[in-house]
Amino acid sequence: MKVMNPRKTNNTFMYYFVLFVCGFVLMEGCLGQNQTTEIKVGVVLDLHTSFSKLCLTSINISLSDFYKYHSDYTTRLAIHIRDSMEDVVQASSAALDLIKNEQVSAIIGPRTSMQAEFMIRLADKSQVPTITFSATCPLLTSINSPYFVRATLDDSSQVKAIAAIVKSFGWRNVVAIYVDNEFGEGILPLLTDALQDVQAFVVNRCLIPQEANDDQILKELYKLMTMQTRVFVVHMPPTLGFRFFQKAREIGMMEEGYVWLLTDGVMNLLKSNERGSSLENMQGVLGVRSHIPKSKKLKNFRLRWEKMFPKKGNDEEMNIFALRAYDSITALAMAVEKTNIKSLRYDHPIASGNNKTNLGTLGVSRYGPSLLKALSNVRFNGLAGEFELINGQLESSVFDVINIIGSEERIIGLWRPSNGIVNAKSKNTTSVLGERLGPVIWPGKSKDVPKGWQIPTNGKMLRVGIPVKKGFLEFVDAKIDPISNAMTPTGYCIEIFEAVLKKLPYSVIPKYIAFLSPDENYDEMVYQVYTGAYDAVVGDVTIVANRSLYVDFTLPYTESGVSMMVPLKDNKNTWVFLRPWSLDLWVTTACFFVFIGFIVWILEHRVNTDFRGPPHHQIGTSFWFAFSTMNFAHREKVVSNLARFVVLVWCFVVLVLIQSYTANLTSFFTVKLLQPTVTNWKDLIKFNKNIGYQRGTFVRELLKSQGFDESQLKPFGSAVECDELFSNGTITASFDEVAYIKVILSQNSSKYTMVEPSFKTAGFGFVFPKKSPLTDDVSRAILNVTQGEEMQHIENKWFKKPNNCPDLNTSLSSNHLSLSSFWGLFLIAGIASFLALLIFVANFLYEHKHTLFDDSENSFRGKLKFLVRNFDEKDIKSHMFKENAVHNVSSPITQGSSSPLTDQSTPLPRSPEQYRELELRRVSSISSGELFTTQSEQVEDEESAIIQCEGE
């Protein structure tokens, strides 16, 4: 019998054992290639709502589609569903259960923004990415959790689209209507900022409770009816929004003139309600909705959806959130496949109890960071458009601008972040208001763009504050009946305001409210408009910069400027007739009178007997002739052409001088020579003079800013008080606006005057709240009133100007006419005179050239004396004397008579001048020697002719 070796038996056993183990390992490896890893994903939704049912259906379809086309993936998402029961606490409890008990790697949900806040904090603590496709509140971003992923657009992305619509139609004010929770409040700051960027403003807010009943909704709607603004931006959940518009239609707020702008909170889910009733109540509404680009993939999905719900109702209508849910699951499945699944476990702290919901035992996922990183890198074209996460959420996308018309949701435009609103069909990007959108049908089936505001017709009157003053009642006078306490406002400002209201294209009924202030502080009255106590302020309110910070002013309806008023000094003067001309003009004129008289004497002395005779006679005649030209009363005739030329030019100069003198003297008597006591306001500061200002006005601060000391400022409340301060010497000058100064001057025109404006202001204007729609219309109406005759009638009624009051615009500065105004005339007269004199001298020297060149008289002095003697003689060759001589010869009286020099029996009477002239001729003839013999007969003939002429 053969005995086996024990050692050999052991080796054989070991061989088979190793072979078995290797085979088992190889088998496990082969089997592992066909196995997948399950990734737990929690889903928290309100399962009893149609919205959640649609989204859950979309999630299941997404999982089926994804793994159908990616069967080779080694990971599979396992969905664990929890019902949040439309409750914030229940949603947080569901998330806590998924994290603690199921140890999910990610959570999808919740449905609302309110449910999401605490869930995000739990997920952040456990490092579990929470992906929401429907929580759009911008406030969730402030949690600043890296594990919060928003696979949808938040509400901040649509506010710029809404602002673009407001800008496109030129509206300036809107009313924000939103649900009273985090969802509604989150959009308001962003909407306000976006509207301000386009110069529009949220002027009022209306909060609607989430669970509001019909009575609460109606109460808020009636409040909206009392507001002037008719542009409403509505942001609320669809269920509340549908009831809101139903009530708005019932009370007539869906008629012409109203503008309703809806956010995508309602527009994205329009089809989730009974289609007919919801759209019927929202005719003419504009809204924005996330734009879903067309694609083949989306088209196929819609066909499959319709097959799944062949008899679909509105509850089964596919919406943008169902598409977002589909894309969210797709993105998560893609991210999971790219991660390392070896870290699929939680790190748990030491438990402090057996309570399953104890937050102290909440584990931390090791897988969360890698999954979050992979998710942020996912990018693909989904059903709702491009899917790419930027900072944990989708980027701002394109929005459709929707107009609800009948049963249709007509797309009339698109809004893009890059170029704003464009026409949906023409892609027009013109900047003209309203032309970027297609035709819009507004509420009430109107095609006219609403102006965005109107005066309420519910009986509410415009509350107008007016100041109660003690003085200057011409502007505003609030008369209060002590018995009935009824107020009757009158005055210039009131009448202007009522005239302006009549020019408006609609009816505005003012209700005047008296503003009583001990110090008549206008700043405080204007501030009441800012607080809402008044709808407007009417009165003598000046437009100044600090007031315009919190209210709006209309265009001014009065003159602008702050001027200085000073007393007049009456400069009555005996020598007032000398005032029109300055001293240099008087002296120059007098010198020219003498000069012209001298020139005329030179030109006329040899040919005109009026300018001959004794020296004193000739001097008197010359002066008389020259000065009598002032009134053209000279009786002497000029016979020389040169003298006539000089006199003609001089008469023109005198005419201009006399007319100017008369006009200026008249103006001096018109203003009565009144002069201001002060002309420079800076002198008041220099000499520390007291000045007055109207109590309660901005003038006080203006004067202090210009350097006036507080002790110099003396207030007054009326024109009478101002006159008293001047009369008793308390003030030297007063500063006030031009309108007030005119009132004072109309009562005391002979005592004070207004110096030119020192400081510029904008004048009086009406006050309205910031961005009030009335401001522009009232400003346009002011232009119509001020440019017409009605304005002048109102001014004449309240500011009657006395007949003896000088023109306030008349300059009281020096109006002396100086030589500089007439030097051209004097230059012409001087040139004409010297030219005539030069011609005369040249002719005279030419006639006596034989004397100048005669060698018998070598002495220059002798020749000069000879020329002087000849100048003093009559020019017998003159046409004047020749004419007289011819007349004497042909006269029948002298015909046949003897010479008067030889006939001594019947001498003709001779004047002393005639004797003097004959004597001079004889002396001249004797002294000339040889000339006497040659010219004696001629002299006798001349004497005879002269005597005969004078005898006649």
UniProtKB/Swiss-Prot annotation:
Main location: membrane
Tissues where this protein is expressed: Expressed predominantly in leaves.
Sites carrying sugar chains: 34, 60, 355, 428, 546, 664, 728, 748, 784, 809
Chain ranges on the Extracellular side, renumbered to this chain: 33-582, 659-821
Chain segments annotated as transmembrane: 583-603, 613-633, 638-658, 822-842
Record GO cellular component, one term: plant-type vacuole
Sequence segments annotated as region (Disordered): 889-914, 932-952
Cytoplasmic side: 604-612, 634-637, 843-952
Membrane topology qualifier: Multi-pass membrane protein
InterPro entries with a match to the protein in the record: ANF_lig-bd_rcpt, GABAb_receptor_plant_PBP1, Ionotropic_Glu_rcpt, Iontro_rcpt_C, Iontropic_Glu_rcpt_pln, Peripla_BP_I, Solute-binding_3/MltF_N
Keyword Isomerase attached: no
SMART domains recorded: PBPe (SM00079)
GO molecular function annotations of the record: calcium channel activity; glutamate receptor activity; ligand-gated monoatomic ion channel activity
Annotated family: Belongs to the glutamate-gated ion channel (TC 1.A.10.1) family.
Assembly description: May form heteromers.
Role this protein plays: Glutamate-gated receptor that probably acts as a non-selective cation channel. May be involved in light-signal transduction and calcium homeostasis via the regulation of calcium influx into cells.
UniProt protein name: Glutamate receptor 2.7
Record organism: Arabidopsis thaliana (Mouse-ear cress)
Organism lineage string: Eukaryota, Viridiplantae, Streptophyta, Embryophyta, Tracheophyta
